[in-house]
Amino acid sequence: MVTPRPAPARSPALLLLLLLATARGQEQDQTTDWRATLKTIRNGIHKIDTYLNAALDLLGGEDGLCQYKCSDGSKPVPRYGYKPSPPNGCGSPLFGVHLNIGIPSLTKCCNQHDRCYETCGKSKNDCDEEFQYCLSKICRDVQKTLGLSQNVQACETTVELLFDSVIHLGCKPYLDSQRAACWCRYEEKTDL
């Protein structure tokens, strides 16, 4: 008769090593989950901040006035080497709108307005007033050329609609253009 051999004794050191290896793997999984959670939270906060800034820009900035200024109160200066983007006529990439009414002088007014927005330090109000003057001149020229009040009225309605759009929806494009054209000396971008 064969007597069964006793089960080999496991050394306490080997058991401890296996236990630690298992615990370390779980700790690593938890650390990875914790880091992923933290990253998700950070990205969520960044998205909320981006949406809030976009809403503020769209509505007229923090103070309700659409003004570009450095956060420390210093005056923005023209960005060295900045090249303005080519004017896009009467439209806004922000809203996916591009108007091609076929009136060259209208496109000229819109292009001048785009350039004004991209001139560092130029106020939105000044740019918009120049734009309104340019637009109203188009209608005066139509009246001189055609002499028909019907055409002038249609021109004035179109100009008024375009100008109202710029007044109410132009803050974000203005601020984006100023951010691109200007530099604030004491501001440095920092990532979270």
UniProtKB/Swiss-Prot annotation:
<feature type="binding site">
    <location>
        <position position="95"/>
    </location>
    <ligand>
        <name>Ca(2+)</name>
    </ligand>
</feature>
<dbReference type="GO" id="GO:0016042">
    <property type="term" value="P:lipid catabolic process"/>
</dbReference>
<feature type="binding site">
    <location>
        <position position="91"/>
    </location>
    <ligand>
        <name>Ca(2+)</name>
    </ligand>
</feature>
<comment type="similarity">
    <text>Belongs to the phospholipase A2 family.</text>
</comment>
<dbReference type="GO" id="GO:0006644">
    <property type="term" value="P:phospholipid metabolic process"/>
</dbReference>
<keyword id="KW-0963">Cytoplasm</keyword>
<protein>
    <recommendedName>
        <fullName>Group XIIA secretory phospholipase A2</fullName>
        <ecNumber>3.1.1.4</ecNumber>
    </recommendedName>
</protein>
<keyword id="KW-0964">Secreted</keyword>
<dbReference type="GO" id="GO:0005794">
    <property type="term" value="C:Golgi apparatus"/>
</dbReference>
<keyword id="KW-0732">Signal</keyword>
<dbReference type="GO" id="GO:0005576">
    <property type="term" value="C:extracellular region"/>
</dbReference>
<keyword id="KW-0443">Lipid metabolism</keyword>
<feature type="active site">
    <location>
        <position position="113"/>
    </location>
</feature>
<keyword id="KW-0378">Hydrolase</keyword>
<dbReference type="Pfam" id="PF06951">
    <property type="entry name" value="PLA2G12"/>
</dbReference>
<keyword id="KW-0106">Calcium</keyword>
<dbReference type="InterPro" id="IPR010711">
    <property type="entry name" value="PLA2G12"/>
</dbReference>
<dbReference type="InterPro" id="IPR033113">
    <property type="entry name" value="PLipase_A2_His_AS"/>
</dbReference>
<dbReference type="GO" id="GO:0005783">
    <property type="term" value="C:endoplasmic reticulum"/>
</dbReference>
<keyword id="KW-0479">Metal-binding</keyword>
<dbReference type="GO" id="GO:0005737">
    <property type="term" value="C:cytoplasm"/>
</dbReference>
<dbReference type="GO" id="GO:0004623">
    <property type="term" value="F:phospholipase A2 activity"/>
</dbReference>
<feature type="binding site">
    <location>
        <position position="93"/>
    </location>
    <ligand>
        <name>Ca(2+)</name>
    </ligand>
</feature>
<feature type="signal peptide">
    <location>
        <begin position="1"/>
        <end position="25"/>
    </location>
</feature>
<feature type="binding site">
    <location>
        <position position="114"/>
    </location>
    <ligand>
        <name>Ca(2+)</name>
    </ligand>
</feature>
<comment type="function">
    <text>PA2 catalyzes the calcium-dependent hydrolysis of the 2-acyl groups in 3-sn-phosphoglycerides. Does not exhibit detectable activity toward sn-2-arachidonoyl- or linoleoyl-phosphatidylcholine or -phosphatidylethanolamine.</text>
</comment>
<dbReference type="GO" id="GO:0005509">
    <property type="term" value="F:calcium ion binding"/>
</dbReference>
<dbReference type="GO" id="GO:0050482">
    <property type="term" value="P:arachidonate secretion"/>
</dbReference>
<dbReference type="InterPro" id="IPR036444">
    <property type="entry name" value="PLipase_A2_dom_sf"/>
</dbReference>
<feature type="active site">
    <location>
        <position position="128"/>
    </location>
</feature>
<keyword id="KW-0442">Lipid degradation</keyword>
